[in-house]
Amino acid sequence: MKKIQTFIQTSPVCSYTEWDLLEEIIVGVVDGACIPPWHAAMEPCLPTQQHQFFRDNAGKPFPQERIDLARKELDEFARILECEGVKVRRPEPKNQSLVYGAPGWSSTGMYAAMPRDVLLVVGTDIIECPLAWRSRYFETAAYKKLLKEYFHGGAKWSSGPKPELSDEQYVDGWVEDEAATSANLVITEFEPTFDAADFTRLGKDIIAQKSNVTNEFGINWLQRHLGDDYKIHVLEFNDMHPMHIDATLVPLAPGKLLINPERVQKMPEIFRGWDAIHAPKPIMPDSHPLYMTSKWINMNILMLDERRVVVERQDEPMIKAMKGAGFEPILCDFRNFNSFGGSFHCATVDIRRRGKLESYLV
């Protein structure tokens, strides 16, 4: 036990929850962001009104003015975190327009804006996730320099099975089933794939959902990889197009949970005794472009500890809700970054939080 404790104390990577005191974080970069080539796996994940935009502009850069505005907000976000005492690291921008591939397919890239999706930190283990989108196949390349540094510093560096992403991984001829009562997922169980953003950490317990990028095979692989110290609980929500859990259910602190009232209509039994804070209805105007998400991206907040929380500056209802629940909102403009498919949690992966492995569920 003494050896384990020493390893944890010296590892540069160590994080067990979404709320322990944040000491180090990676903030993404939006430079060079490209619109991914259209693929059937994207259809159930993207807003219907954006499908034609992606089809018409596949492989092209995102509008430069959008990139510039988002970069400005990201840099300010990083500055705010540093002012709050957090060490901020950034990935290396990569040329997303380069063509790459594997047997049977080719693609260009997308961006390195959302480290939350591609890297999962559980304890002292930083895991590269086997992503389901072909356009994200080499996305972790932007983080390799940091990953090597963390490994040399004592962290455990793991990687999920590198997927083939052949046609067998996707439902042939997928179409929306209007009569379905549960999500009609576009990925199969051919091989394990998962995005880190379909998991949220509560010490010894990890909440997960199956989605259009995360399959049961991937969840089972992760559970076996993590071993008996952790238990993954797979929950199903009232979401017909699941992709990433942070706009559905967000642990804020021990015993406090932010929930999407449209998707979480009944409190999961494992959260018995927890306080449920209903996320206020988003107020983002319809005129603001959201290429990849719904307006519920307003739930994608970031806890710096059990009290401080980063919230979008213009989201007055969320600011009020956080204050009412006893939290201290730290405000940051982020709507232009929201256009690219994420907010504060998506734009980051916490590398080190000051805490220990505990159980918080009944």
From Swiss-Prot:
The active site is at D195, H244, C346 (amidino-cysteine intermediate). Keywords: Transferase. PANTHER family: GLYCINE AMIDINOTRANSFERASE, MITOCHONDRIAL. It comes from the Bacteria. It comes from Pseudomonas savastanoi pv. phaseolicola (Pseudomonas syringae pv. phaseolicola). Belongs to the amidinotransferase family. It catalyses: L-lysine + L-arginine = L-homoarginine + L-ornithine; L-canavanine + L-ornithine = L-canaline + L-arginine + H(+). This is L-arginine:L-lysine amidinotransferase. GO terms for molecular function: glycine amidinotransferase activity. One of its GO terms (biological process) is creatine biosynthetic process. Disruption phenotype: Mutant loses the ability to synthesize homoarginine and phaseolotoxin under permissive conditions. Its EC number is 2.1.4.3. Involved in the biosynthesis of phaseolotoxin, a nonhost-specific toxin which is a key component in the development of the halo blight disease of beans. Catalyzes the transfer of an amidino group from arginine to lysine to produce one molecule of homoarginine and one molecule of ornithine, both being precursors in the biosynthesis of phaseolotoxin. Can also use L-canavanine as an alternative amidine donor with L-ornithine as amidine acceptor. Changing M243S: Abolishes amidinotransferase activity.
